[in-house]
């Protein structure tokens, strides 16, 4: 069994950075992509959403980050974790974290502690504890449940808004 950790980072210019793996010779291969979400309205007022290459991004743009992991080994793999920080100069868009067969948790302390949204606590301006807002999340963690067979892939994703 292997435990994999992928870190997805973006510079303030939102260029997709490198992945960091928990093991040097891992049977898990990761690929990462960042895409800009655009909305189009047709002549009848129907809105559709599509994804494009990042290109130029401006405040208010929505970016979708996707990490795909593939078992290139010869054995089943379990205990796969994917950890992604929310890039600087962005805010996480609530309920946008996705991943089949995964359990998702969040952090508000730069990845030191993870919990479900209802359990994330912050100190408010009045000094009282309150539940953290999605835009206050600093990191996202997916735990892949089950086993990943040789040749099988999985993916996780989340959206942010550029500040």
Residue ranges and their predicted role:
Residues 2-6, 20-163:
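Exported/extracytosolic protein signature
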Residues 7-16:
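Bacterial N-terminal signal peptides
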């Amino acid at each position: 069994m292997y435990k994999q950790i992928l870190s997805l980072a973006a510079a303030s210019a939102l260029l997709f950075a490198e992945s960091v793996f928990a093991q040097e010779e891992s049977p898990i291969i990761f690929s990462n992509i960042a895409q800009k979400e655009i909305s189009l309205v047709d002549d009848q007022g129907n809105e559709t959403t599509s994804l494009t290459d990042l290109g130029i991004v401006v405040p208010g743009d929505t970016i979708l980050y996707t990490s795909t992991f593939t078992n290139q080994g010869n054995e089943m793999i379990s205990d796969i974790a994917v950890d992604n920080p929310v890039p600087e100069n962005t805010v996480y868009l609530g309920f946008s974290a996705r991943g089949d067969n995964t359990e998702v948790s969040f952090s508000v302390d730069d990845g030191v502690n993870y919990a479900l949204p209802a359990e994330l606590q912050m100190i408010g301006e009045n000094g009282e504890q309150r539940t953290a807002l999605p835009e206050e999340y600093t990191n996202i963690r997916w735990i892949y449940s089950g086993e990943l067979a040789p040749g099988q892939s999985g993916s996780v994703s989340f959206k942010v808004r550029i500040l």
